[in-house]
């Protein structure tokens, strides 16, 4: 039977009101928060421990689908000499995909007790700065931004994975963007 589970929640559990406490303002965020409640119930009723991961904007090799995949697609387009427009603006937390993989591996190897959730904010910056870092690697890149900021606070705080997993660290934007460009 199942003794431990790692699952993907989302920074979408946060709305635009609070950096620390979930207050979803979309059906997607409300659903993800409900799943976290189900995980707590399974721990309380059946002793099944879990780790829920709430990533903000994941970018990197393979992240090519979803509403926030635009920054990865911008890296790919720049490398291939194509123009691209990222479909959201403003500040957000950017998480390199390997950081999420590393957290899953740490969770599986240490199997903490309880129904834990971790906010995976990554590095907070403006989308325009992310684009400038792409252009630092590929000066002739034709990348634009069009769209509104995400419907989540610009930075999620608290419940850091490093509180439990001492070796957990975020990849710098410079390194993550370079690795993403190199992949394509």
Model-based region annotation:
Residues 1-27:
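Conserved Rossmann-fold NAD(P)-dependent oxidoreductase catalytic core, especially the SDR/UDP-sugar
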Residues 50-58, 73-95:
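A conserved pocket-lining segment of Rossmann-fold NAD(P)-dependent short-chain dehydrogenase/reductase
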Residues 1-5, 47-49, 115:
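Active-site loop of short-chain dehydrogenase/reductase
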């Amino acid at each position: 039977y199942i003794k431990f589970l790692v699952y993907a929640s989302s920074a979408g559990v946060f709305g635009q009101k609070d950096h620390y406490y979930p207050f979803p303002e979309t059906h997607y965020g409300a659903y993800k928060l409900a799943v976290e409640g189900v995980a707590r119930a399974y721990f309380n009723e059946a002793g099944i421990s879990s780790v829920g991961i709430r990533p903000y904007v994941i970018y990197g090799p393979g992240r090519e689908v979803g509403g926030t995949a635009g920054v990865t697609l911008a890296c790919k387009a720049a490398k291939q000499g194509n123009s691209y427009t990222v479909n959201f603006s403003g500040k957000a937390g950017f998480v390199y995909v390997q950081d999420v993989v590393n957290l899953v591996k740490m969770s599986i190897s240490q199997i903490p007790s309880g129904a834990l959730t971790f906010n995976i904010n990554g590095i907070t910056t403006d989308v325009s700065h992310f684009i400038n870092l792409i252009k630092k690697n590929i000066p002739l890149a034709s990348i634009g931004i069009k769209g509104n900021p995400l419907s989540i606070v610009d930075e999620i705080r608290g419940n850091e994975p490093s509180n439990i997993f001492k070796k957990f660290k975020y990849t710098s934007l410079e390194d993550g963007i370079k690795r993403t460009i190199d992949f394509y």
